[in-house]
Amino acid sequence: MAFTATKRELGELYTFFRLLADGQVNMGTASAQIKENDLRPIAMIQRIEHDGARRYYIEQNDVRIVFGEIEKRTNLFVAKTDVEETSFPREDFDAAASMILSSLKSQSGEEIEVCDELEGFLDTVRIFDLEAKTEDRTDISIAFWHPEAPLTGFSIRCRLSPMNPLLDGGRTANLKLEQSGVKFAVPTVNKVNALPESPNEVMERMLMIERLGGVLKYNDVADKVFRCNLLMIDLHFPRMLSEMVRLMHLDGITRINELVEHIKEINPLKIKDELINKHGYYEHKMKQFLLALALGMRPAKIYNGTDSAIEGMLMTNGDGVVLCYHKSDSQTFADFLFQNTRLEKGPLEKDKYGFLERENGTYYFKLNVKIGLVKR
């Protein structure tokens, strides 16, 4: 009996099967194209499910699967003695990947009905979790060149499906703007906050505050951990970021590289032209931030500059080609993120932003930071 799965789940599974079938991966360019003459052979992929770990050894014609557990103390893979190894032709994974790709391209909506043939294959190879289950937020880990090579942790993004954001807003990712200028009475505040829901209600409230003589000026990061994480990029980075989010709402510009171009003109940090144009200060700081996010920085977790288990990203493009980005080529990785990310709007009610609220006698207006990858 067929079952349904989300496009995001199937996008991750497609990427995994494509790598098993191909036994290699293309390195990507900053513009999300294949980097010529730069293929990385894959010897083994490790994937975690709810009932343990699997190691998929890519041999000449087959994929050999070893079932095991990750020992918590040493973080080493230990094979299970009560489960036999199994092998399947690589062409079977190629056929399964093609089925998923066809479904992703042809079916609309968030969920897809998985055909009986694909369901049967998943049961045969004992894949029960369509998305990997890890504590370190990696989707898969890869041994390049040789099966005993050190494992490299990757997150997966697929442009054929909705993608997990690089920075998933939430109320911990709120920035506080202080309302100054005219002192608002409670009825005025209520009038601002009562503007009806719409795709542009944050912009409409900000413009209304301005029309009524109010001024919104960056004050602080709402969450102390996220504040410190941003300060690790630069002591003035929160101010720059808040100006970008403000521009996104007021001018409708969402792409990160375009927003940074506007920031260079506005120059909210009042730095010298030489620093802006010759040294590329604003671009550099944004790329630093995006790379930190891609390698594991989160709003509510203390960031000390040490990378997490995630060392790179696998990006599947709209044609089903998998591109690999790794921190060893941090320049290309950062340029790719800079050219292919955008600011997004999180839900106002859930993330608690976009309205005036009183705190210690002063009114504040919060903006929310959410960053995702563009579809194309």
Task: Give the positions of each predicted feature.
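Short, positively charged
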Residues: 1-136, 143-152, 156-376
